[in-house]
């Protein structure tokens, strides 16, 4: 493959992030149609919609963890992303409290970056293969903490209900019955998926990543490089476009 990338970046990683961003925009567009405009789409809340949603968040979180060691100033970047998550929470609480976002994906990613930056020295001492395996196992074990237990399948360790108390416990993954958020990604289990991506980078290594410098679709790369800003802007833009489109469709045609 001939590389047209001269920036020194791993272009394919940007493009994968951009592709995932497009998928997320389409998913959120469907969310608007179903929840705000009343369009009937049973598949959206069925298995197809769930798998679509999970594919988006898995790629985002794994890729974010993978790319941590490619950049610098992890703590500063984490603070920026966490602040963006706080902004999303504030805006939704103010303007659309019934569809509020509390502890959404940006809050998770910012928290994961901050924790990774603080724990960078001990994390780097862990062999990448062992770190990846441990992270994957812990992700599987904590996948259902929101449902009240550790484990999977028939192997379940039920947790005390006193853990599920308030917003602080919800941040960690133990949300009480009254907690509500349209986008919820707690530290447990998702921090371990982030760290799985972090250790996956160590397994792959920079030498084997050279083919990732080759660009396949530059427009997707541009989206990937500006993913945080586009994430913050995409929902109001999509809502406005859908609203104008539906108004135009519903207008009676003039003779």
What are these regions (language model features)?
Residues 1-250:
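Alpha-helical transmembrane segments and their immediate juxtamembrane cytosolic regions
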């Amino acid at each position: 493959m001939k590389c047209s990338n001269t920036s020194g970046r791993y272009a394919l990683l940007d493009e994968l992030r951009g592709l995932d961003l497009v998928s997320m925009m389409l998913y959120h567009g469907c969310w608007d149609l179903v929840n705000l405009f009343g369009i009937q789409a049973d598949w959206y809340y069925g298995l197809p919609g769930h798998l679509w949603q999970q594919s988006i968040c898995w790629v985002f979180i794994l890729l974010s963890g993978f790319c941590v060691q490619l950049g610098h100033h992890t703590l500063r970047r984490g603070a920026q992303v966490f602040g963006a998550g706080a902004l999303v929470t504030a805006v939704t609480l103010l303007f659309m409290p019934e569809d509020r976002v509390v502890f959404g994906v940006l809050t998770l990613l910012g928290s994961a970056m901050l924790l990774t930056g603080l724990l960078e020295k001990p994390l780097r001492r862990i062999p990448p293969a062992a770190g990846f395996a441990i992270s994957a196992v812990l992700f599987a074990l904590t996948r259902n903490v929101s449902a009240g237990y550790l484990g999977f399948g028939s192997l379940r360790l039920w947790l005390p209900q006193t853990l599920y108390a308030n917003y602080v416990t919800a941040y960690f993954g133990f949300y009480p019955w009254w907690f509500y958020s349209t986008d919820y990604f707690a530290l447990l289990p998702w921090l371990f998926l982030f760290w799985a991506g972090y250790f996956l980078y160590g397994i792959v290594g920079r030498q084997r990543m050279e083919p990732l410098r080759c660009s396949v679709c530059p427009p997707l790369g541009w989206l990937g490089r500006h993913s945080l800003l586009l994430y913050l802007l995409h929902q109001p833009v999509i809502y406005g476009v859908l609203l104008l489109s539906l108004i135009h469709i519903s207008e009676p045609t003039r003779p």
